[in-house]
């Protein structure tokens, strides 16, 4: 069991989100405006899966697309910053997961913790989210 660990965002790898109007995205949680790959009424599911970058991003993501703590993390090549929705809806872009347990453990070893401070309110749209900023501070 010790070898078990997270293996990256499953959006467009082994998950799909299908909205009521036929819009396809890699995960039901992802924002439609940014992550819609197409509509099942206009394209085949196979074409949406294979040809659209909105669904392919999790299959093709590398360490080079990561930023912040996640880019330098020991698990970066496997985890690739974990859940894309978590980072995107919190920090405005994917590639740096502020809710990672390993991250907390490693920062604690350095006597540091992180907290999120709100920077922008959610715009009151479907699948909306506000913006936060990571603030590092010494452990109390």
Indicate where each model-derived feature is located:
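C-terminal accessory region of radical SAM enzymes
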Residues: 1, 23, 29-74, 80
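Short, small/polar residue-rich loop motifs at catalytic or cofactor-binding pockets
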Residues: 9-13
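Short capping/connector residues at structural and topological boundaries
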Residues: 14, 42-45, 105
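Gly/Ser/Thr-rich beta-alpha loop segments that engage phosphate groups in nucleotides
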Residues: 14, 28, 83-84
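Short, acidic, Ser/Thr-enriched surface-loop or helix-capping motifs
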Residues: 18-19
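Short Fe-S-cluster ligation motifs
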Residues: 55-58, 97-140
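Cysteine-cluster motifs in flexible loop/terminal segments that predominantly coordinate metals
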Residues: 64-110
């Amino acid at each position: 069991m010790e070898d078990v660990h997270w293996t990256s965002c499953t959006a467009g790898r082994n998950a799909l989100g299908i909205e009521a109007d036929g819009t396809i995205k890699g995960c039901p949680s992802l924002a439609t405006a940014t992550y819609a790959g197409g509509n099942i009424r206009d394209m085949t599911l196979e074409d949406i899966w294979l040809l659209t970058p909105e669904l392919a991003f999790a299959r093709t993501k590398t360490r080079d697309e990561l930023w912040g703590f996640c880019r330098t993390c020991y698990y970066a090549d496997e985890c690739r910053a974990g859940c894309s929705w978590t980072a995107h809806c919190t920090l405005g872009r994917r590639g740096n997961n502020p809710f990672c347990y390993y991250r907390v453990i490693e920062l604690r070893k350095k006597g540091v913790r992180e907290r999120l401070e709100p920077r922008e309110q959610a715009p009151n749209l479907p699948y909306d989210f506000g913006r936060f900023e990571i603030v590092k501070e010494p452990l109390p």
